[in-house]
Amino acid sequence: HKEYRRQRQMCIRDRKDKTCCFSGHRNLGKYDYNYVYQRTKDIITLLAENGIVYFGTGGAIGFDTIAAKAVLAVREIYPQIKLILVLPCEDQARYWKAENVEEYNKIKEQADKIRYVSKSYYDGCIHKKNRHMVDCSSICVCFLTDFESGTAVTVDYAIEKGLDVINVADEFDDVL
């Protein structure tokens, strides 16, 4: 825990103003995948053009995967940006379907940095991962449609900590 705290303090001091985190649902509901992906990519592009360098995502199925893929696409145009995977545990994908594991591993291979909150899963490791990402960021890009969810808890924490929050599910003109 001591090393984790030291790293956390270091990231807050050194990179917070250049860092964006992502939080979102695993299920997109009525939203079209390509629509969410394109909007996320557009927001990342705007952030990259305005000095955001580090983009942290939790690597889960759903919006985390969309965000990671969007960062990788934007990185082709803005090579200075970095994809940071902040994963709750090393065995996160243990019970996933094969196609999800394959996509997850491809993203891990292309990430600039991978940080694990814990070696193995325990109650609370996802919550700890979410708080770590918020604590190290100045902006939170989210996909929030269910206000009684873990994503809502993370976004509320981001607001409490003073982060700018951009919800991909909001009207695009209102966001930018």
Question: Could you tell me what each predicted segment is?
Answer:
Residues 1-12:
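Single conserved hydrophobic/aromatic residue that forms the stacking wall/gate
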Residues 13-176:
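Acidic/glycine-enriched connector segments
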